[in-house]
Amino acid sequence: MVGVKPVGSDPDFQPELSGAGSRLAVVKFTMRGCGPCLRIAPAFSSMSNKYPQAVFLEVDVHQCQGTAATNNISATPTFLFFRNKVRIDQYQGADAVGLEEKIKQHLENDPGSNEDADIPKGYMDLMPFINKAGCECLNESDEHGFDNCLRKDMSFLESDCDEQLLITVAFNQPVKLYSMKFQGPDNGQGPKYVKIFINLPRSMDFEEAERSEPTQALELTEDDIKEDGIVPLRYVKFQNVNSVTLFVQSNQGEEETTRISYFTFIGTPVQATNMNDFKRVVGKKGESH
């Protein structure tokens, strides 16, 4: 049984987050005598055992007033989500079903601790920071669309009319990019020449992508697109990235269509907290909204 670990004092909070590493950490901020906190406690405990790949912590806002203040806790129960000590989301209230859906959402496509060896110390897999609703892919096939390349399974993204793809990836907060993983098949359909653009004010078309100067151009080898391949980026050029546009010009074997099995970015958020994502709740202390 994994269980929920109480955080006894303010100095204990950051070490607990550090210990979670790249795993999802779900932190419940609670208060003694808070009715909604008591109601959701059994479900929260059950989730901690149901999802052992995540770390579950509990913080009493009276025992850890500094931690509560730093994280702008204004009502209980409030649940904050962290990865690599970076706050990535929050959930408020005692709806166990809604909380579990949020947990499952963040565990979907979890990079997992088994990939830590591939990621340099101080960086993280940025998949949790990709805003899927803000992503776009031109020339994707109907049968093998863009969402497939964000999952580590047997599905894949495939181009439609020819070998080219134009992919825009949006992040839910500014990030710094260090490298990326770009996986493809070994049958000649894997991507080869790729132009990378960042922070475009509007979507570009294929003609614009052809003639525009990229932030960085890549010539991928067959080794680069293997499962353990990592493609370095010019880190100084990717310091404050809100979106990335990838123009896949060609594939390894001059095949009719291009396939991408999976891709993700390695880097760090620019800031530890994206306050625009979190609405401060005005209410009395201990009041749930």
UniProtKB/Swiss-Prot annotation:
* Gene3D superfamilies according to UniProt: Glutaredoxin, PITH domain
- Keywords on record: Cytoplasm, Disulfide bond, Electron transport, Nucleus, Phosphoprotein, Proteasome, Redox-active center, Transport
- Show the Pfam families listed in the entry: PITH (PF06201), Thioredoxin (PF00085)
What SUPFAM superfamilies does UniProt report for this protein, alphabetically? Galactose-binding domain-like (SSF49785), Thioredoxin-like (SSF52833)
Any one Gene Ontology molecular-function term assigned to this protein's record:
disulfide oxidoreductase activity
User: Which sequence ranges form a coiled-coil region, renumbered to this chain?
Assistant: none
Cytoplasm as UniProt keyword = yes
Q: What does this protein do?
A: Active thioredoxin with a redox potential of about -250 mV.
Its recorded name reads Thioredoxin-like protein 1
Q: Which organism is it from?
A: Mus musculus (Mouse)
Q: What is the lineage of its organism?
A: Eukaryota, Metazoa, Chordata, Craniata, Vertebrata
| Encoding gene, per UniProt annotation | Txnl1
